[in-house]
């Protein structure tokens, strides 16, 4: 049996936390974005934008990658029928990733925090299609990556706010309202927010 270790929470690293783009974000791809950080160390960082939608629906993606056929669309479980894909970031945009609750674990699963995991194999898609898989999940195409020291510099230059990532905020279906609700959760008045803010 494989033993899965939880990621270390070394001081200064942001594993399992949210980044919220500041209003002065210079990269338009990340404007008003909420990014969930999955891995952060001295070697760099990676995460997923969770509040930008992809034009492809989950059933269509399953069909495109050969998990199901056209005739299977009508028998998809309700959750799979309504699952939407997120634009995870500008890197490797054709690759799929699933962030999910820790009640699903296979050899390729990477624990991100005490209750969130990441799986990037087709097995989890088949499990969801079959009505199983994790209780809570979101799928992203592509990811966001930072070189060593790059994310730390962007945070120091007030490109991002950082905050804890409540499960309800991570997995809820209100994608378009997520940025504003997280700002309120942090006690920040958007009308007064300026680009010289710091950490929450």
Curated annotation (Swiss-Prot):
One of its GO terms (cellular component) is cytosol. It holds the Pfam family DUF179. SUPFAM superfamilies: VC0467-like. It comes from the Bacteria. Belongs to the UPF0301 (AlgH) family. This is UPF0301 protein BOV_0485. The lineage of its organism: Bacteria, Pseudomonadati, Pseudomonadota, Alphaproteobacteria, Hyphomicrobiales.
